[in-house]
Amino acid sequence: MENTEETERFSNDICVLLLDSDATCLANLSEMIRKCGYKVVATTRADDLPLIINNKDKKIDLVLAEFRLIEMNKYELLEKIRSICEIPVVVSGAHVKDAIVECLCRGAKLCLEKPLMENDFKILWQFTVSRQRNFRSQIDINPPEKNHSITHTQSLGAELKKNNNNSEVETEDLDKYKDELGQGNKRKERADTDTGEHTEKNNGSDLGDQKKPKLLFADDLQNETLEAVPNIEEANNERKAPTEIKKNGESSEKKSPELVCMEEELQKWSAESFIDLTASVENESQDPLESVGDSVGPHEIPLSPPESSNNNVAAQLQMPTHEALDEEVMQDGLSLSDLEVDLQEGHGSNKELFDKIFTDLAKELKP
């Protein structure tokens, strides 16, 4: 720790009592303590401590004593100093580490191990300052009581009197205002004998003038609004139309769309297509048969009328060949190739065949 100005200021007023049984060590320590700015009182005898401490000429602020003395035990010195007065004691020695806790419990403020250095003495003033502060705090705990008196000057009394008069005036005005307010809230009804109408009379006419005026919509502003929006009346009428219908009790339910029967439409479509197909078949049946010798080779078989008519019908229906149709089977287990064979053999009439085809199609398309 550096020797600051604050350390020098406090150390100049502190007197240290140095106690050591070795005279050489005592002289060296005294020199180092004086260099730090302390006043030193040195002795080698522990029996001289009471005389030195009680001496009024030199006030002792701190005791720096060796831990092991010849005349006394290591703890007897602390107990003796504590019995005389409350002075901070700093203990020094070569083997002080073993008894630091015991020394602190018996009243020691600090334990220093030898050899001592100059920096060890620069912090001694802190123990004396803390002791002085504790002593002053004990003195100021119960300060003497002082008799305090309050004197009112003439200006203060006049001001208080003026404030009292103003408060009385304010209370009178407040009472008057409450009375007027109570009268204004009272309304009386009177009946006109001629017309039989009831009118209200307000006793507090002044309070009625203070009411908030009503907001009126000017005619000029309304006309300008109607000119700016010419269709506003029509929009209002359209908006009121549903409410008027609802008030009159008329039903405003929307009509549900008509349902279309798919089966009837399918039968109608099948009948029309059947008529067209029968007409085309009859026209082809009236054509002359193809000649065998002219258009057919020696190893070719001429087409018979049923075969040519069946092929034309299949082409009009845009149906695939029997090889691809054999893979597709109808719901009743009958393939289109079987129907073609029946046509070639002449089983059944064309009308029955087409009726069967369209009924099967109707079953598949029926939802």
Curated annotation (Swiss-Prot):
Residue span of region Disordered: 158-213, 227-259, 282-312
Organism of this sequence: Arabidopsis thaliana (Mouse-ear cress)
Pfam families for this protein: Response_reg
Gene Ontology cellular component list: nucleus
Keywords noted in UniProt: Coiled coil, Nucleus, Transcription, Transcription regulation, Two-component regulatory system
Coiled-coil region list: 158-192
Entry's family note: Belongs to the ARR-like family.
Composition skew (Basic and acidic residues), residue ranges: 189-212, 236-257
Name of the featured protein: Putative two-component response regulator-like APRR8
Span of the signal peptide: none
Location, primary (coarse class): nucleus
